[in-house]
Structures are given as structure tokens and as C-alpha cells.
Amino acid sequence: MCIRDRPYSVYGGRKGKNDYADDINTRSMMTNWLGGGSVYMPAMDGKRVPIELSLALHSDAGYNPDGQSTWGALAICTTDFNDGMLNSGISRFASKDFAKALRDNLVEDMTNTFGSFGKRYLWDRNYSETRLPEVPSAIIEMLSHQSFPDMRIAQDPMGKFTIARSIYKTILRFVSSNHDEPYVVQPLAPNHFSVEVDELGYASLTWNAQLDKTEPTAKPTSYIVYQAEGKGGFDNGTMVRSNIYNVKLEPGKLYNFRVAAVNQGGESFPSETLSALYNPT
């Protein structure tokens, strides 16, 4: 497939007269062009790429007069178009289910991490980004640039991670449900990681599983301990089943360690990196 052979109508529907409208519409039109002919868009011409969802992430505007509470998140879908049907023949209410799940799960995950997070509307309106895609589609609006409480979260790396993980979990659940398949969510990184070196030069690494309060399947089943020596990079890791790992250190050599959690959903981000040095006296 060559992306250069896409029709001009995909990205230039306004024929150069309105770049703003073309910019809004292009991603949806490209989705349809790529997915046309697949099982998700069988009645359209295209490249048969099996794209089954469309999601737009928008920063928001607005603030609460108290200056203390978050403006939160809202979601948007479009059901009143093409007789309420998508190209595959399924109802556009699948988009509403998707949008509602995105908003509700995001509010739950953010509230668990940061305290109360604003739950705003579920809009069923005529927006290009949810009208044009021929697969279930949604817009999620969040992180208002006019709201200081929201911007505190937006600039916090944990805020960005929590949002991204929440959206990942919703997409995984939604797709798995549509296919009637089980799912397992990737675990969170281990926490309370520590290393202690005894008088014989053995390093004892310990950590705790970090559980996802809103997703029981994210429990780790094993861990990977990564090790680096001296100025070298980390190795490919050692799989362990428990939350303790012992290793003999060579005198005078610096060691670096980090740990990742694993389950059937994948591997977590690594823990913080801890260093150990054995200098016998």
C-alpha cells in the first residue's frame, strides 16, 4: 500500500478553499479510505485496513468559578446520521457506548489518583470527527487550558500517564466486548522498590505489586528484573515469580537494577532504577 495514492478528496475536499475544514475532516476521511473494504467498512472502497474505532483527543476550555475544582471531561458522539447505522450495519449507538465508557472510566481513574475529577456531559451532536468515520467513534474533551486545577494535572507526568492508561483500558474493554473475547490489562509498575547489600556482597532486591484499583485483571503474575553493570546497559532481564531477588555483587563494581511487572496483558513500565555497590572492608 502506498499512502501517496490516496484520492485528493480524502485530504482536499474543500479544494484548497478552506484548510480549517479540510484539517478537521481529513483524519476521518483517511480512516474511511484506509478501512474501506475491510470487515468494518465492507460497503466502501479502500485499502482494507481493519480499523475498527476512531477516537479524537481534544483539550478543553472552561473553568469552575471556585477556582479549586477541576473542569473535568466530556465525551461526544453522533448517532443521528445515515439512518443511525455505520457502514458494517451496526448501530451508531455503539459510538455512544464508546463515548460514555471513555468519559466514565476517565473520571473514575482520575478521581482515584487525584481526588474528585469533574464529570461533564455526554453529547450526542453533529461533530465532523464523530459523524464522518464509518466505525464507532468518539471525542473526549479534557484538560481545560482555562482551568488551573486541570492544568496542574496536565503538567504532572502521572496525570498524563493516568489519562493515557484510562483510555487504553477503555479501548481494550470495548474491543474485547465487541468480539466477545476475554481481556487482561497490562499491570502497573512495581513500587516500594528497595535494595540492601549484606556484608558478604549479596544484594537483596524487594518490591511490591502496584494494583490497579479500577481493574482487577491488571494484577501481575511475574516480574522481570533488569540488571546493568558498570557503564554497560541493562540486560534482557531475568523472569522471577516472587517479589524478591538476590544477586551476588563483585567488589568495587557498580550495579543498577530495575523491575517490571508482567501478566498476559503485557509488561509494565519499569520501576525506578536503584544502584548498589559492594565495598568490603
Task: Please give the residue ranges for each predicted region.
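Conserved small/polar residues in nucleotide/adenosyl-binding loops
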Residues: 1-5
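Pro/Thr/Ser/Gly-rich low-complexity, intrinsically disordered linker/stalk tracts
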Residues: 173-217, 266-281
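Solvent-exposed loop/turn segments flanking beta-strands in beta-repeat/beta-sandwich domains
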Residues: 210-228, 234
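Beta-strand-rich modules
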Residues: 246-269
